[in-house]
Swiss-Prot record:
It is an enzyme of class 5 (isomerase). Its cofactor is NAD(+). Substrate binds at residues 115, 139, 168, 185-186, 202-204, 217, 277-280. Pathway: Carbohydrate metabolism; galactose metabolism. Homodimer. One of its GO terms (molecular function) is UDP-glucose 4-epimerase activity. Its EC number is 5.1.3.2. It comes from Corynebacterium diphtheriae (strain ATCC 700971 / NCTC 13129 / Biotype gravis). Belongs to the NAD(P)-dependent epimerase/dehydratase family. One of its GO terms (biological process) is galactose catabolic process via UDP-galactose, Leloir pathway. Transmembrane segments: none annotated. InterPro entries: Epimerase_deHydtase, NAD(P)-bd_dom_sf, UDP_G4E. This is UDP-glucose 4-epimerase.
Length: 328
């Protein structure tokens, strides 16, 4: 297939592009490099630097594309609260421009990178796709609004579409892992402490209603995530918009993550308890039963030790060689 990948110089987009190329697909990547990195674009992909809302028509009209995988987005929750205008522009407005360009160029197959942030604070866990959607920040709100837009395009214009709502993506694949200029994810933050780039890791509360008092999250390996995108792409149905949760179905606490990082790296990794953050749920675990049933997807790398080991293999060589890969 000939595929357009937006945001393909970022963490998730570059790994998915790598796997698509390995499977023989032709990949064109569009990225404005705001958070992505040119070095993360895999060999064999055609690269176009630019904002998708400005170049989508030209790119889509230049070749006979079969589908679009849409990863390009701003994704920092805290920043979205401080700069909601930028998030609505970069996420919602840009996606509408992409959808319109797809319609004009008769490319009507799309897989969208959505998020578990669309659910907000869950009423029950594990979280299924029919759980109420009450995002608690502009980032989640923009993604949910895009889901609604895609549904309307599927019904009105025959788009074949899937939205994949990720939980906590982690790990690395090959030469690509998490290396953002502004890091907010727990595993890379802890590994930065192991490398000596940070003094300590903060645990936001140790009095949560969990076994060890720290919040529990569901971590999905980046390679398993890539597999889900390919399965969704291959099974999209004209005039339909499907939504799937993607997680391992297993939960690990903050303390478990820190202890596993200590075990994998051999470093002490100082940790300090800080006050709880407003809006943090105690437990977030996905139900991926629908994806397993309808897509035939089954995560293969659910063990926390495997996820951390792959992340450390990337992070440690990054620290040693001081070269950058994916920042997005």
């Amino acid at each position: 297939m000939k595929l357009l990948v937006t945001g393909g110089a970022g963490y998730v987009g570059s790994v998915c592009s790598t796997v698509l190329l390995e499977q023989g697909h032709e990949v064109t990547i569009v990225d404005n490099l705001t958070t992505g990195n040119r070095d993360a674009v895999p060999l064999g992909a055609t690269f176009v630097e630019g904002d998708i809302k400005d170049v989508a028509d030209n790119v889509l009209s230049s070749d006979s594309f079969d589908a679009v995988l849409h990863f390009a987005a701003r994704s920092l929750v805290g920043e979205s609260v401080e700069k909601p205008d930028e998030y609505w522009q970069h996420n919602m407005v840009t996606t509408l421009a992409l959808l319109d360009a797809m319609k004009r160029n008769n490319v009507r197959n799309i897989v969208f990178s959505s998020t578990a942030a669309t659910y907000g604070e869950p009423e029950t866990v594990p979280i299924t796709e029919d759980a109420p959607t009450h995002p608690t920040n502009p980032y989640g709100a923009t993604k949910l609004s895009i889901d609604y837009a895609i549904t309307s395009y599927a019904h009105a214009y025959g788009f074949a579409a899937t939205s994949l709502r990720y939980f906590n993506v982690a790990g690395a694949y090959g030469l690509v892992g998490e290396n953002r200029e502004i890091e907010t994810h727990l595993i890379p933050l802890v590994l930065q402490v192991a490398l000596g780039h940070r003094d300590k890791i903060f645990m936001f509360g140790d009095d949560w209603p969990t076994e060890d008092g720290t919040p529990i999250r569901d971590y999905i390996h980046i390679r398993d995530l890539a597999d889900a995108h390919i399965l969704a792409l291959q099974s999209n149905v004209e005039g339909s918009h499907r939504i799937f949760n993607l997680g391992s179905g297993e939960g690990y606490s903050v303390k478990q993550v820190i202890d596993t990082c200590r075990e994998v790296t051999g470093h002490l990794i100082p940790a300090e308890v800080a006050p709880r953050r407003a809006g943090d749920p105690a437990v977030l675990i996905a139900s991926s039963a629908k994806a397993q049933s309808e897509l035939g997807w089954k995560p293969q790398r659910t063990d926390l030790h495997t996820i951390v080991s792959d992340a450390w293999a990337f992070t440690s060589q990054l620290g040693d060689k001081a070269h950058s890969a994916s920042r997005g």
